[in-house]
């Protein structure tokens, strides 16, 4: 049996595009949990890199914008080159809390060779309505492509085992790439997903914490994700049978304290 994964066994990969507002807080929070942080600067034209220049991290710079998918690919490649057992991805805008990193690792040990998703289930009513609707619609399509239900397919805070990081030739860019990673891991490796409840932070009308405007564009990006996933579903065939199988396979929530099941309802959700 493999030794449990600990923080030094993984890398934190942070794709960043014009994140000068929050990037230092994000990186310092990640370093407090894990000594191995890889920042992918996607052609930023602000002071993103300068804000963290004195911190003990690896920085990979794109001279021009290549998209989040390219950033994740480069981060995965660097992590695999250095022999890490997995990668935790998190966004550079501060919406993900580094305090959830130990819980992601705990779930990775409870469910070996699973992708672990930080699912935005806590205080979900605070999520902007347009984002919540887009996420729920995307969840349906991506789950169909994978063959099983998933809680929050579009969260950027995830643990990927090394076997998934090493997958080559994954199509798609930006948010489409993250969706395709789940589908390819399922179809090519038989890897399932498990989710842990997290709270994602959003810009409030008032308050001291500021975030930059999201790079996610609901109509544009949802269309790109949906059209791509539909193409994948059709390519795999047996569309109705796959739909029935997906509906019959509940999402997995790693919730050892019972926090989520006591407060929110996915009645078909399995907890671990």
Where are these regions (language model features)?
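Hydrophobic helical membrane-anchoring modules
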Residues: 1-7, 147, 171-272
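Acceptor/aglycone-binding surface of glycosyltransferases and processive sugar-polymer synthases
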Residues: 63-66, 70-81, 98-175, 203-216, ...
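A conserved acidic beta->alpha catalytic loop
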Residues: 41-50, 94
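Acidic helix N-cap motif at the loop->helix transition within catalytic regions
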Residues: 21-25, 46-54
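Short beta-strand/loop segment that forms part of the nucleotide-sugar
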Residues: 14, 27, 35-44, 60, ...
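Short beta-strand-to-loop acidic/aromatic patch adjacent to the donor-nucleotide binding site
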Residues: 84-95
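Short, structured coil segments at secondary-structure junctions
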Residues: 33, 54-56, 189
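N-proximal low-complexity "stem/linker" segments adjacent to membrane-targeting elements
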Residues: 1-29
């Amino acid at each position: 049996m493999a030794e449990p994964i600990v923080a030094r066994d993984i890398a934190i990969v942070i794709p960043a595009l014009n994140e000068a507002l929050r990037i230092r807080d994000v990186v310092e929070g990640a370093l407090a949990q894990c000594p191995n942080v890889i920042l992918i600067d996607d052609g930023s034209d602000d002071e993103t890199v300068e804000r963290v220049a004195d911190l003990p991290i690896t920085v990979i710079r794109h001279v021009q914008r290549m998209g989040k998918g390219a950033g994740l690919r480069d981060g995965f490649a660097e992590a695999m080159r250095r022999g890490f057992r997995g990668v935790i991805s998190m966004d550079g805008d501060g919406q993900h809390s580094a305090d959830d990193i130990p819980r992601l690792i705990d779930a990775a040990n409870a469910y070996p060779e699973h992708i672990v998703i930080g699912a935005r289930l806590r205080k979900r009513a605070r999520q902007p309505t347009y984002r919540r609707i887009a996420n729920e619609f995307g969840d349906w399509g991506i789950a169909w492509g994978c063959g099983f239900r998933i809680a929050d397919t579009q969260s950027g805070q995830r643990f990927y085992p090394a076997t998934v990081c090493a997958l080559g030739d994954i199509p798609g860019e930006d948010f489409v790439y993250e969706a395709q990673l789940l589908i390819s891991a399922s179809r090519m490796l038989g890897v399932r997903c498990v989710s842990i409840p997290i709270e994602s932070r959003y810009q409030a009308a008032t308050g001291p914490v500021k975030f930059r405007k999201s790079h996610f564009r609901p109509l544009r990006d949802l269309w790109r994700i949906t059209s791509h996933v539909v193409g994948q579903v059709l390519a795999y065939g047996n569309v109705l049978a796959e739909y029935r199988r997906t509906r019959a396979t509940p999402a997995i929530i790693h919730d050892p304290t019972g926090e989520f099941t006591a407060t929110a309802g996915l009645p078909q959700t399995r907890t671990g």
